[in-house]
UniProtKB/Swiss-Prot annotation:
Keyword Transmembrane in record: no
Protein name in UniProt: Ribulose-phosphate 3-epimerase
Positions contributing to substrate binding: 6, 62, 138-141, 171-173, 193-194
Catalysed reaction, written as an equation: D-ribulose 5-phosphate = D-xylulose 5-phosphate
TM stretches of this protein: none
């Protein structure tokens, strides 16, 4: 299992130390919120540029914004590995996904908990990652919604049919109590914020999620 600690849960007063404490992660998950699509504001490109100078861990950028094309171009110079947009918020998602791909970045598509998985069927060939929200977006520290496990199974079947190389990622309320179920549901990447950043040993917490089979053996 690949693990992406969510910087939304980090202490920004000590950002360098926080990032070093999760340096064994597979990705750093960055939530970009504009205060319009979701009722919260987070980091911009200046903060994220500092992050790239502190860490070699690839960036996984999740855009929760009204104008995804603008923000994709704004963050592209920082060379994130992934930029994901919300299916619910784009009139022309293919166009935005192609823009992200043309910028040399893996495009991803995001589904909120209430959005039907069939809505992304015709987008799957255009993305390298599907991100399923297992909480309602906008704030960290929320409880995992169990209904998303069934959705994972359905999305994984769509991925197998339309784009087998596409990764399945889940974000929200992920911890050591539900990681095995997520693995069984076909999830490839988990985003975890509060669980990791509240752990006494963050690197050990990450390893526990990464090595889910061994930790449960």
């Amino acid at each position: 299992m690949k693990v992406a600690p969510s910087l939304l849960s980090a202490d920004f007063m000590h950002l360098a130390k926080e990032i070093e404490s999760v340096s064994n992660a597979d990705f750093l998950h960055v939530d970009v919120m504009d205060g319009h699509y979701v009722p919260n504001l987070t980091m911009g490109p200046v903060v994220l540029e500092n992050v790239t100078q502190m860490s070699q861990v690839p960036l996984d950028v999740h855009l929760m914004v009204e104008n995804a094309s603008f923000f994709a171009e704004l963050f592209a110079p920082l060379k994130p590995q992934i930029i994901s947009i919300h299916a619910e918020n784009e009139k022309h998602p293919h166009r935005v996904l192609q823009l992200i791909k043309n910028l040399g970045i893996t495009p991803g598509i995001v589904l909120n908990p209430h959005t039907h998985e069939e809505s992304i069927k015709y987008l799957l060939e255009s993305v390298g990652l599907v991100l399923l929200m297992s909480v309602n977006p906008g704030f960290g520290g929320q409880k995992f919604l169990d209904l998303v496990l069934e959705k994972c199974l359905k999305v994984k079947e769509l991925i197998k049919r339309y784009n087998p190389s596409c990764l399945l990622e889940v974000d929200g309320g992920v911890n050591d109590k539900n990681i095995f179920e997520l693995q069984q549901a076909g999830v490839d990447v988990v985003v975890s914020g509060s669980y990791i950043f509240k752990s006494k040993d963050r690197k050990l917490a990450i390893e526990g999620l990464q090595n889910v089979r061994q930790s449960l053996a």
